[in-house]
Amino acid sequence: MTSLDIAPFANALVLGLSIASIWLIAAIGLTIIYGTVGVINMAHGEFIMLGAYTSYALQSTLGLPFLLCLPASFVVVALVGLIIERGLIRYLYNRPLDTLLATWGVSLVLMQGVRLIFGSDPKYIAVPEIFQSNVEVGFASLSVFRLVVLAITALIVAATAYLFYRTRFGMQVRAVMQNKEMAASFGINADRVYMITFALGAGLAGIAGSLFGVLAIVLPTMGTAYVVQAFLVVVVGGGTLMGSVAAAGLTGELQSVFAFVTNDTFARFLLYVLIVVFLRFRPRGLFAVAKGRR
């Protein structure tokens, strides 16, 4: 195989890795919320969408640079998640069907609210010119922005791992996940843990939305498609941080390779078939999390 033959395939691999990185950020938010709170958050896609619209609004009104839009999106969407958790979700813990329906209702409210404020026309998030250039690495021509995405993802994964495995708060989260009653007997406030982790998961979805908004158009319905991929990453990964990292890389690269060989639509079909077969033989995912009493 010549360098000319290898180059498109190498570019496809890098493309898959960068897309998988954004899926991973969104999936980490889902993993945090489900693993700690036990809530299947149907509004997670709308948190992604809110992050994209936050970046768009800050750019169009204040002229805020893209890199500053990322932490701003995190804060704004985390606050929205905090309000939703305090105002609704906390009253529905240990009621899976009710939380499922409630978060689905929240997703519809958020979607229609954004449509009323911004309209249904597509919006775009701009990045600095330096991010729009390419660099030659071996056989591949890599987008600088995609390399920035990989760096941001690595930073978020490292920060999340440190928070949950090297801090007092992380110890409290893991204690609540294993046994809420036992954790309470040691003075751990489970409600506070739930509140913070829900907001944190929402904020991470906001960052993912800002990154997705650069690679695609920003629409009120954009979160629906992206949250499916995030759920797949969580399920295949087994609901753990390291499992999500492995699952995001695996699914992203597989879809990219399939799309390179066939097309995007058939690539998704093949990926979903493989996931169904995988879950048939390993229903708890790559790295299953130990379940305790909530």
Annotate the PLM regions:
Residues 1-25, 54, 65-69, 95-100, ...:
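Membrane-interfacial amphipathic/re-entrant helices at transmembrane-helix boundaries
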Residues 2, 91-166, 193-196, 262, ...:
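Transmembrane helix-bundle core of multi-pass membrane transporters
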Residues 8, 98, 178-192, 261-294:
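Cytosolic-side transmembrane-helix boundaries in multi-pass membrane proteins
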Residues 8-59, 83-98, 236-239:
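Single transmembrane alpha-helix segments in multi-pass membrane proteins
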Residues 52-56, 74-80, 106-114, 152-161, ...:
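Hydrophobic core segments of alpha-helical transmembrane domains in multi-pass membrane transport
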Residues 63-107, 113, 247-251, 282-283:
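Alpha-helical transmembrane segments within multi-pass membrane transporters and channels
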Residues 63-75, 195-205, 209-275:
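Transmembrane alpha-helical segments in multi-pass inner-membrane proteins
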Residues 141-218, 242-246:
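Helix-loop-helix "hairpin" substructures at the membrane interface of multi-pass membrane proteins
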